[in-house]
Amino acid sequence: MADDRKAALDAALKKIEKNYGKGSIMKLGEKIDQQVSTIPSGSLALDVALGVGGYPRGRIIEVYGPESSGKTTVALHAIAEVQKNGGTAAFIDAEHALDPQYAQKLGVNIDELLLSQPDTGEQGLEIADALVSSGAVDIVVVDSVAALVPRAEIDGEMGDSHVGLQARLMSQALRKLSGSINKTKTIAIFINQIREKVGVMFGNPEITPGGRALKFYATIRLEVRRAEQLKQGTDIVGNRTKIKVVKNKVAPPFKIAEVDVMYGQGISQEGELLDMAVEKDIVDKSGAWYSYKEDRIGQGRENAKNYMSTHPEMMAEVSALVRAAYGIGEDVEIPEETQAELPLEE
């Protein structure tokens, strides 16, 4: 009887593979790749918080937060890292607000960046689907979900009610996109805004537009918020920003990366490297003084950052020590409970 069941199962598996291709069904432990393939986020602190050294390929990422918190900056740094590694990047600018000069300062090669400024939400998501399905694009950024306006809303009058249109649009699009994103190993970053529910007395009244679909389909959700202003004398030169990993399917969630987002420069590599080096006792902090190998590098954090920026060899040495201390760049195994979500490969 057992042999009959095994023969029937083998016949069914052969039929499935014949109809849908090799690798369409297999035993979970048979050929699965248990390593997460990632690309760096452009921030060492965020790479550590993500737990796998960057953004996992073939997954959906949501980046949300208040206005001017640094959401687009986070996405542009990811694009710059993809291009540094020889990849192709696309930016769906639904807000029609991308600043090419700022993107260039962050390291983005604007001559090679694919840019689309769609008229409707359907058009933007169809373009994203076409790019992902091609298999030739490594990262697609949609800025932002809130600006993906359904065609019916654009064609209608200003005061017309369109209940749930955007949520249905996102739900349908993500059903189509999720499979091809996984298959082509494309990283899809959706930037989102926040709104507030009216009449909420208890709990957090903040919600993200576009319905619940993106929350479910996203492997990682990042909440970006300004913590404090950074000043040089009386001039405000940037913001101290907290990036919280609210959801993470490939590593433990709820870790926080604190970075300096400098105006016109993006995330300060020196600032986060200095903080992480102090945390691991690679750089010594005594009072206001920072020292490396018994040599003082600056009094106060800003002076120490300036010293590191003018001494690239020392910065590279500290960076290597910090990466080794945090295990960045090493292969990371996926937790057993999330292995089932991996794409099947031939």
UniProtKB/Swiss-Prot annotation:
Keywords: ATP-binding, Cytoplasm, DNA damage, DNA recombination, DNA repair, DNA-binding, Nucleotide-binding, SOS response. One of its GO terms (biological process) is DNA repair. Disulfide bonds: none annotated. InterPro entries: AAA+_ATPase, DNA_recomb/repair_RecA, DNA_recomb/repair_RecA_CS, P-loop_NTPase, RecA-like_C, RecA-like_N, RecA_ATP-bd, RecA_C_sf. PROSITE patterns: RECA_1, RECA_2, RECA_3. Pfam families: RecA, RecA_C. Belongs to the RecA family. It is found in: Cytoplasm. Can catalyze the hydrolysis of ATP in the presence of single-stranded DNA, the ATP-dependent uptake of single-stranded DNA by duplex DNA, and the ATP-dependent hybridization of homologous single-stranded DNAs. It interacts with LexA causing its activation and leading to its autocatalytic cleavage. It comes from Enterococcus hirae (strain ATCC 9790 / DSM 20160 / JCM 8729 / LMG 6399 / NBRC 3181 / NCIMB 6459 / NCDO 1258 / NCTC 12367 / WDCM 00089 / R). GO terms for cellular component: cytosol. The keyword Transmembrane does not apply. ATP binds at residues 65-72. This is Protein RecA. Signal peptide: none annotated. One of its GO terms (molecular function) is single-stranded DNA binding.
